[in-house]
Regions:
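Flexible "cap/lid" loop of the alpha/beta hydrolase fold
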Residues: 51-54, 90, 97-110
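Residue in the alpha/beta-hydrolase core beta-strand immediately N-terminal to the catalytic nucleophile
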Residues: 70, 93-96
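Active-site signature of alpha/beta-hydrolase-fold catalytic machinery across serine-
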Residues: 83-87
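Active-site nucleophile loop of the alpha/beta-hydrolase fold
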Residues: 18, 43-46, 96-105
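Short helix-terminating capping/connector loops at secondary-structure junctions
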Residues: 9, 90-91
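Gly/Ala-rich beta-loop-alpha elbow adjacent to hydrolase catalytic centers
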Residues: 71-82
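Active-site catalytic motif of lipid deacylating hydrolases and related acyltransferases
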Residues: 2-3, 7-67
Length: 110
């Protein structure tokens, strides 16, 4: 039987949404509600991503954490984590990347 773990078990997790900040019914938001100790990256503008600004938002969130986190990223958040990992020496427990967009695709923002 598969059971859902509703405790944090000491896991530090950081939710990294994509464009729109994963609204109320989104799986990232539901997971955050189930795990009140988890944190979420904050961005100034969730609808117009600017790589340098979003990297600063991720840096700020990482600075608040007590241990290397599981980075739970969705969509544009996956690309943010990839860019951040190239330039950061901070450790992470694991990346959990879901539905990374194709930057060469027609739906990708300019």
């Amino acid at each position: 039987m598969l059971r859902h773990n509703t405790t944090n078990d000491g896991v530090v997790a950081l939710i990294v949404p994509g464009i729109g900040n994963s609204g109320p019914g989104h799986w990232q938001t539901l997971w955050e509600e189930r795990h009140p100790g988890w944190q979420r990256v904050q961005q100034r503008d969730w609808d117009r991503p600017v790589c340098a600004e979003w990297l600063r938002g991720l840096d700020a969130a990482m600075a608040r954490l007590s241990a290397p986190p599981v980075l739970i990223a969705h969509s544009m958040g996956c690309l943010l984590v990839a860019h951040w990992a190239k330039r950061s020496s901070l450790p992470v427990r694991a990346p959990f990347l879901v539905a990374a967009p194709d930057p060469a695709g027609p739906m990708f923002p300019p």
